[in-house]
């Protein structure tokens, strides 16, 4: 399994995805689940969760379409709605190869895609395995896929329409760290990408281990703060106050 988060802030977009893939306790591998297209008038970031074979096939199809420079590709799509539709069609095509009984075998993947095309607003979409897609709620401008239950609470508390890209970045790392601590199927290194509004190039793209300073400073301080606040809570009247 995996965990991916995308956050649309006022001044940019943040993506984070883990890179652990498991096929049983004795078969754990590392694969990047992030795809970045940063050319000309647009920046597009994609992360994926689900069947690894399908996800890699979709990414390969995107690369091949860009090389052929004909038909539909990330450069010819007029807006992110078309990009989401394009990824959805590739997802359907690659999740049901010939000879596979789709009634008994689940080969679907889901994708988060976001960024900006020049002259258009920041966009963020979730593309489902069935090919359809959604945008985040205006009141909660983030989307998550994969093992979402551990990293979602901090997002619900912190991420608002007014959130800055810096706070969104810190929240994304804390959300990822919360998931790593509770789910063994999610693991480092963490692919982390930041896009700033109207720049049309990636501001930062890194592969972070939990010992890297940029990651550990935020997550260690968060953990320490939780312990300090918890220890300061008022005591119940039935507790021994000695």
Identify the residue ranges that each predicted region occupies.
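N-terminal nucleophile
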Residues: 1-242
């Amino acid at each position: 399994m995996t965990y991916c988060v995308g956050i649309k802030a006022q001044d940019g977009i943040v993506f984070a995805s883990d890179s652990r893939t498991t096929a049983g306790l004795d078969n754990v591998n590392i694969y990047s689940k992030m795809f970045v297209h940063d050319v000309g008038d647009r920046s597009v970031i994609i992360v994926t969760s689900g069947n690894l074979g399908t996800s890699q096939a979709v990414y390969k199809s995107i690369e091949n379409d860009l090389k052929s420079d004909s038909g539909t590709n990330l450069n010819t799509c007029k807006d992110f709605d078309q990009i989401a539709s394009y990824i959805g069609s590739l997802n359907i095509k690659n999740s049901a190869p010939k000879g596979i009984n789709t009634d008994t075998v689940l080969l679907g993947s889901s994708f988060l895609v976001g960024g900006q095309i020049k002259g258009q607003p920041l966009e963020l979409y979730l593309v489902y395995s069935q090919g359809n897609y959604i945008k985040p709620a205006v009141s909660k401008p983030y989307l998550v896929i994969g093992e979402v239950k551990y990293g979602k609470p901090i997002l619900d508390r912190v991420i608002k329409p007014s959130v800055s890209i810096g706070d969104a970045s810190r929240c994304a790392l804390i959300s990822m760290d919360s998931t790593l601590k509770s789910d063994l199927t999610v693991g480092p290194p963490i692919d982390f990408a930041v896009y700033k509004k109207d720049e049309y190039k990636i501001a930062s793209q890194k592969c972070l281990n939990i010992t890297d300073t940029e990651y550990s400073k935020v997550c260690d301080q968060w953990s320490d703060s939780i312990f300090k606040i918890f220890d300061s809570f008022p005591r119940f009247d039935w507790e021994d106050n000695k």
